[in-house]
Amino acid sequence: ASATWGAAYPACENNCRKKYDLCIRCQGKWAGKRGKCAAHCIIQKNNCKGKCKKE
């Protein structure tokens, strides 16, 4: 799901993708800390959705 999220919001992707990609890398590299990384990802994703709606 995380891999296709950006495609659903093309207008915001460039603005948010860098920070969101950090989440994806975090989830991939730190499996033991996935809960913390996932929580950060959810926050980041919601922030980007909010920006997208405003645009």
UniProtKB/Swiss-Prot annotation:
InterPro entries: Neurotoxin_B-IV, Neurotoxin_B-IV-like_sf. Changing residue 25 to Q: 400-fold decrease in toxicity. Changing residue 13 to Q: No change in toxicity. Disulfide bonds join 12-52, 16-48, 23-41, 26-37. Changing residue 21 to P: 10-fold decrease in toxicity. Changing residue 25 to K: No change in toxicity. It is found in: Secreted. GO terms for cellular component: extracellular region. Keywords: Disulfide bond, Hydroxylation, Ion channel impairing toxin, Neurotoxin, Secreted, Toxin, Voltage-gated sodium channel impairing toxin. Changing residue 17 to A: Complete loss of toxicity. The keyword Nucleotide-binding does not apply. Has the structural arrangement of two alpha-helices stabilized by disulfide bonds (CSalpha/alpha 4(S-S)). Belongs to the worm B-toxin family. This is Neurotoxin B-IV. It comes from Cerebratulus lacteus.
